[in-house]
């Protein structure tokens, strides 16, 4: 006789209506994979990471009641303050930020995340950057929906030319609106496949002095579809993904321009693939962790520069300060990191990364002298109580002669939780 769900109820500390968490409801078949999905849905909320399910005999023969047991201290609002030097010299190297996450604001086990980031040189009117965003998501069994809006602005001053022209301020602004659906069509005790469907709008504007630069004007509606699979192993995990994104010219008010393509119709398409591996192992009594990630991008036709793959910096090829990068419509990034524990909950790590760009845009700027970067980095990260840190020193190992970067790149990131 198949088991069925009796009732679903909370054991105190309820933060919302639990129905959206569960793929099946009262009187539906009891399935372990459904319970795994529901538990993942609730634990994605920061304040519910310790939530557990109790399974109790139901009132009818074959029924099982599900009791949602929440943490004793489940704060619904979390704040994370950040400070780092991940910016650019041209728009503000040092950055300050805050992230506010609200659990179940609509009592649907949904989540609202609001972020704000700014350069630390608030009194400097010649350079600066700000970023802000708001995103909301909600689970619906094996699916989830999300919407978001973000804005990024920057200002810098272009140097005066040799002919005597005055320095001019350059201001840029990007806004993005997004709606997404994610579905889990396949799940086992050790693996999960996720499909994603995203519709977005991107609006770019820039001004040089008081003049709007029409060459940089874009208002593009686009799509992004993809599939990702995660497989848990005894001592690690494997992740693989494939995606396609592109534009919808019929809905785009201003598709922008592509160099050397005066008759471009605004349609572009890109393919991406990602493969990542996490592995834990021992050498004698010491534990190590390895993480490797390979990301590939290919554009079969013309694409705007906003879609180019950029390499050279802490989030792509480490060892470079990020002030100058290589960019191209096609390319790949391979990141490798080996870490081991040190003094308590902290760890030290070493990284070796490489990347290459090709296709449109790759031979412009520093790319005229080469299209490949190789860099390395060593660092330490960890935390104490509510404070976290990540400090690393990196250096370029191989680069084009025309790409200017510091001989040693210092990457610092600090966080504080409230």
Give, region by region, the residue ranges found by the protein language model:
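Periplasmic polypeptide-binding modules associated with outer-membrane biogenesis and secretion
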Residues: 1-87, 117-130, 292-295
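C-terminal outer-membrane beta-barrel translocator/porin domains of Gram-negative envelope proteins
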Residues: 205-362
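Repeated loop/turn-to-beta-strand initiation elements of outer-membrane beta-barrel proteins
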Residues: 76-78, 106-112, 141-147, 188-193, ...
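Transmembrane beta-barrel strands of outer-membrane/channel proteins
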Residues: 55, 81-85, 112-118, 147-153, ...
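Transmembrane beta-barrel wall of Gram-negative outer-membrane proteins
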Residues: 111-113, 124-219, 223-227
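Hydrophobic, lipid-facing positions within transmembrane beta-strands of outer-membrane proteins
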Residues: 94-98, 130-134, 175-179, 221-225, ...
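Outer-membrane beta-barrel "beta-signal"
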Residues: 100, 380-388, 405-418
């Amino acid at each position: 006789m198949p088991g069925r769900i009796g009732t679903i109820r909370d054991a105190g500390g309820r933060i919302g209506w639990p129905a959206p968490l569960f793929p099946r409801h009262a009187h539906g078949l009891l399935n372990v994979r459904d319970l795994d999905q529901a538990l993942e849905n609730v634990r994605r909320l920061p304040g519910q990471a310790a939530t557990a399910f109790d399974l109790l005999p139901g009132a009818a023969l074959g029924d099982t009641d599900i009791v949602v047991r929440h943490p004793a201290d489940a704060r619904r609002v979390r704040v994370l303050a950040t400070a780092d030097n991940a910016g650019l010299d041209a728009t503000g190297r040092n950055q300050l930020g805050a992230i506010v996450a609200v659990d179940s604001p609509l009592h649907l086990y949904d989540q609202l995340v609001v972020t704000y980031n700014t350069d630390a040189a608030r009194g400097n009117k010649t350079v600066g950057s700000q970023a802000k965003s708001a995103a909301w998501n909600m689970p619906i069994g094996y699916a989830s929906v999300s919407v978001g809006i973000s804005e990024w602005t920057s200002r810098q001053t272009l140097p005066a030319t040799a002919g005597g022209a005055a320095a001019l301020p350059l201001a840029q602004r990007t806004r993005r609106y997004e709606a997404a659906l994610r579905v889990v069509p396949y799940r086992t005790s050790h693996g999960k496949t996720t499909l994603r469907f995203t519709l977005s709008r991107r609006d770019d504007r820039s001004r040089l002095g008081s003049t709007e630069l029409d060459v940089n004007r874009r208002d593009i509606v686009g799509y992004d579809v993809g599939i990702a699979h995660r497989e848990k192993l005894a001592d690690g995990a494997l992740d693989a993904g494939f995606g396609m994104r592109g534009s919808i010219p019929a809905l785009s008010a201003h598709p922008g321009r592509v160099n050397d393509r005066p008759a471009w119709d605004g349609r572009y398409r890109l393919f991406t693939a990602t493969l990542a591996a996490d592995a834990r192992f021992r050498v004698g009594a010491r534990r190590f962790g390895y993480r490797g990630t390979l990301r590939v991008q290919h554009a079969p036709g013309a694409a705007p520069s906003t879609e180019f793959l950029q390499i050279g910096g802490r989030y792509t090829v480490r060892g470079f300060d990020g002030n100058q990068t290589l960019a191209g419509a096609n390319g790949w990034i391979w990141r490798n990191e080996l870490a081991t524990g040190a003094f308590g909950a902290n760890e030290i790590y070493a990284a070796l990364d490489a990347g290459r760009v090709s296709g449109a845009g790759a031979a412009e700027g520093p790319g005229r002298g080469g299209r490949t970067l190789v860099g390395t980095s060593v660092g330490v990260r960890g935390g104490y109580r509510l404070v976290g840190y990540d400090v690393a020193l990196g250096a370029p190992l191989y680069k084009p002669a025309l790409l200017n970067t510091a001989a040693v790149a210092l990457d610092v990131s600090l966080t504080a939780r409230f």
